[in-house]
Amino acid sequence: MIGRIWHGWTKPENADVYENLLESEIFPAIAAKGTRGYRAIQLFRRPQGHEVEFITIMWFDSWDAVKQFAGEDYERVYVPAKARGVRARFDERSQHYEIRHKLDY
């Protein structure tokens, strides 16, 4: 399993707008791509002074699935134009990690 991690920040007044955009449009559009091996996405949010930080973690079965989703330059971020307007800044590259252990209790 591979985790694709990405960070973005908004101004506090745009945080709810951005979260709604993710949930109502961007996440469904990602799922609609039909990437074989794409399993899940998680959204994390926290206030950070004059910004609000968002982290997404996407779960993929394999490196091949990550590359099917993002292309050969798989660290390149996927940022729809509509989302760029409500964010203050964002990571230009995603980080990827092999998930070695997952324990659910």
Regions found by a protein language model. Name each.
Residues 2-9, 40-74:
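Short, well-ordered beta-strand segments in beta-rich or mixed alpha/beta enzyme
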Residues 4-8, 35, 83, 93-94:
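Residue-level signal for functionally critical sites in structured catalytic/ligand-binding pockets
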Residues 12, 60-62, 98-101:
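Non-catalytic surface loops within mature trypsin-like serine protease
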Residues 14-40, 77-82:
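Short amphipathic alpha-helical segments
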Residues 15-17, 65-67, 103:
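Intrinsically disordered, low-complexity acidic/polar segments
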Residues 39-53, 78-105:
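Glycine-rich beta-strand-turn "strand-cap" elements at beta-sheet edges
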